[in-house]
Amino acid sequence: MTTQTDGRRLRGDRTRRTVLDGAVQEASVRGLDALSFGALAASAPVNKSAVAGLFGSKENLQLATVERASEIYTEHVIVPARSAERGLARLWALVVAWTEYSRSRVFRGGCFFRTVEVEFDMREGCAVRDAVVAAQESWESYLVHQGQLAVDAGELAADTDPAQVAFEINALLNAANDRSLLLGDDGVYERALTAARSLLVARGADRAMLG
């Protein structure tokens, strides 16, 4: 009996992952509000009622989609950068990994979080908005932390504001993502890297450490 139960749970987990992998791609293009049990069932090996049974409500589906997108984001941006030394080297590795994540269309619609943060930015008190905010705050705080480590190590000037550096880097990355999608111009990623490199060098970074 236990073996049968474990087998059903394993199949359910696999099905849930398959549905969510489709959901993050769809939401990156059309937004989280566009998700529906029926549409996701059409592209997964289950019917609409089975998808509904996995999540219970549309909000739960949206929350699970944000969580899955965060996992994929971590896999493609955070994990590759961990091989670099903490501080300036890792900060730069994060910038490079992010540009590759967007450029390679890990999500069909470019950066998943760019799509959904615009969709939910004015919906205060919404659980899905809270999840999107938490994901973005986690990313930004990680950038700030690496910037602070760089300052502490003397890799950036002592008067550098890590939060300002993180803000400017984020702005460059987001602009590259948006313009690449709108204009079909992948050259914007190199321009973003050039601009990010310049802002770090202006704050005392060693150009040789920045690729």
Regions found by a protein language model. Name each.
Residues 1-14, 207-211:
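N-terminal intrinsically disordered/low-complexity leader segments
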Residues 64, 78-109, 162-169:
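Hydrophobic alpha-helical connector segments
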Residues 90, 105-127:
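Amphipathic alpha-helical segments used for helix-helix packing
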Residues 101-104, 149, 169-186, 199-209:
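Amphipathic C-terminal alpha-helical segment
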Residues 108, 125-152, 164-167, 191-194:
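Amphipathic alpha-helical packing segments from all-alpha helical-bundle domains
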Residues 109, 114, 158-179, 191-198:
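Hydrophobic alpha-helical segments that form the core
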